[in-house]
Curated annotation (Swiss-Prot):
Family, as annotated: Belongs to the G-protein coupled receptor 1 family.
Lineage, broadest ranks: Eukaryota, Metazoa, Chordata, Craniata, Vertebrata
Disulphide-bonded residues: 97-188
One GO biological process term: sensory perception of smell
Protein name: Olfactory receptor 8I2
Gene that specifies this protein: OR8I2
Entry keyword set: Cell membrane, Disulfide bond, G-protein coupled receptor, Glycoprotein, Membrane, Olfaction, Receptor, Sensory transduction, Transducer, Transmembrane, Transmembrane helix
Stretches of the chain found on the membrane's Cytoplasmic side: 47-54, 121-139, 217-236, 292-310
GO cellular component: plasma membrane
Record has Transmembrane helix as a keyword: yes
Gene3D superfamilies xref list: Rhodopsin 7-helix transmembrane proteins
Segments traversing the membrane: 26-46, 55-75, 100-120, 140-160, 197-216, 237-257, 271-291
InterPro entries in UniProt: GPCR_Rhodpsn (IPR000276), GPCR_Rhodpsn_7TM (IPR017452), Olfact_rcpt (IPR000725)
Subcellular location: Cell membrane
C-alpha cells in the first residue's frame, strides 16, 4: 500500500494528548470507566433482548445491532488508547493503523445507516400500524439490518485505500487513534484529491442517512400532530423520542468533526469531539434507549423474576 512513499513508514506514533502528561492518569481512568460501562451496558442490553421473547421484534432487533456496533467501534479505539496512556512509545504499526481506521470508519458508517433503518421502522409503526407486521417482515428486517454493514464497510474500504496509498513524511499522528484527518496531515504530497474522496464519502454517508431520518421524522411528526388526543400524541412521540435524541447527539458530533473540507477546526477541537463520539456516545446509547423505555424495564423485571423464582 505504501509503495509510492518517499519515506517508508512502518510505524506511526499516536501522540494525541501526549503534551499533557499531568492528565495521563486521569484520562486513563476516565477512558477505562467509560469503556467498561459501554461494554457491560451494551452487552447487557443485547442479552436482555435475547432472553425476553416479548422483545423479539424488529425495533429491538435493530437496537441489539446498534449495541453490537457500539461495543465494537468503541473497542477499535479505546483499548489501544488505554495502553498508550500507560506507555512512553505510543506506537502502532502501519498495517495496524489502517486496520483500526477501516473498522472504525466502517462501523461509524454502519451506525449512520442503522439509525436510518430504525427511523424507517418507527415510521411504519406510527404511520401504518395495521400493516406493521406485513411491511416489517423478517426478510425486510434482516435486509435493513444487513445493508448498513455492506454500505458502511464498502465506503470504509475506499477511504482507507486512497489514504493508505499516500506518501507520508512524518510518523507522528497528532491524535489518540488513526483518524483520517490526522493522517492526511502527515502526507508529503498534495492531498486535495484524497481529501475530496474522503469528503464525498463522509458527506454521502452522513447526509444521505440524515436525509432519510429527517424526511422520516417530518412525516412521523406530521402524523403525530394529527392525533386527536393529547395522551395519544404523547404515547406516539414517546416511542421515537429516544431515537431522536440519539440521532441528534451522534450526527451533531460527527458533522462538527468531519464535514469541514477546508480543515478550519483545530486539532484540539477535533480530538475533544472525537472523544465524545468515540467513547461517550456508545456509553450513552444503552442509557438513552433503556431508561425511558417501559418495554425494556418490564423485560428486565421479568428476567429477574424468572431467575429468582424459577
Amino acid at each position: 500500500m505504501a509503495g509510492n512513499n518517499f519515506t517508508e513508514v512502518t510505524v506511526f506514533i499516536l501522540s494525541g494528548f501526549a503534551n499533557h502528561p499531568e492528565l495521563q492518569v486521569s484520562l486513563f481512568l476516565m477512558f477505562l470507566f467509560i469503556y467498561l460501562f459501554t461494554v457491560l451496558g451494551n452487552l447487557g442490553l443485547i442479552t436482555l433482548i435475547r432472553m425476553d421473547s416479548q422483545l423479539h421484534t424488529p425495533m429491538y432487533f435493530f437496537l441489539s445491532n446498534l449495541a453490537f456496533i457500539d461495543i465494537f467501534y468503541s473497542s477499535t479505539v479505546t483499548p489501544k488508547a488505554l495502553v498508550n496512556f500507560q506507555s512512553n512509545r505510543r506506537s502502532i504499526s502501519f498495517v495496524g493503523c489502517f486496520v483500526q481506521m477501516y473498522f472504525f470508519v466502517g462501523l461509524v458508517c454502519c451506525e449512520c445507516f442503522l439509525l436510518g433503518s430504525m427511523a424507517y421502522n418507527r415510521y411504519i409503526a406510527i404511520c401504518n400500524p395495521l400493516l406493521y407486521s406485513v411491511v416489517m417482515s423478517q426478510k425486510v428486517s434482516n435486509w435493513l439490518g444487513v445493508m448498513p454493514y455492506v454500505i458502511g464497510f464498502t465506503s470504509s474500504l475506499i477511504s482507507v485505500w486512497v489514504i493508505s496509498s499516500l506518501a507520508f513524511c512524518d510518523s507522528s499522528i497528532n491524535h489518540f487513534f488513526c483518524d483520517t484527518t490526522a493522517l492526511l496531515a502527515l502526507s508529503c504530497v498534495d492531498t486535495f484529491g484524497t481529501e475530496m474522496v474522503s469528503f464525498v464519502l463522509a458527506g454521502f454517508t452522513l447526509l444521505s442517512s440524515l436525509l432519510i431520518i429527517t424526511v422520516t421524522y417530518i412525516i412521523i411528526i406530521s402524523a403525530i400532530l394529527r392525533i386527536q388526543s393529547a395522551a395519544g400524541r404523547q404515547k406516539a412521540f414517546s416511542t421515537c423520542a429516544s431515537h431522536l435524541m440519539a440521532v441528534t447527539i451522534f450526527y451533531g458530533s460527527l458533522i462538527f468533526t468531519y464535514l469541514q473540507p477546508d480543515n478550519t477546526s483545530s486539532l484540539t477541537q477535533a480530538q475533544v469531539a472525537s472523544v465524545f463520539y468515540t467513547i461517550v456516545i456508545p456509553m450513552l446509547n444503552p442509557l438513552i434507549y433503556s431508561l425511558r423505555n417501559k418495554d425494556v424495564k418490564n423485560a428486565l423485571l421479568r428476567v429477574i423474576h424468572r431467575k429468582l423464582f424459577p
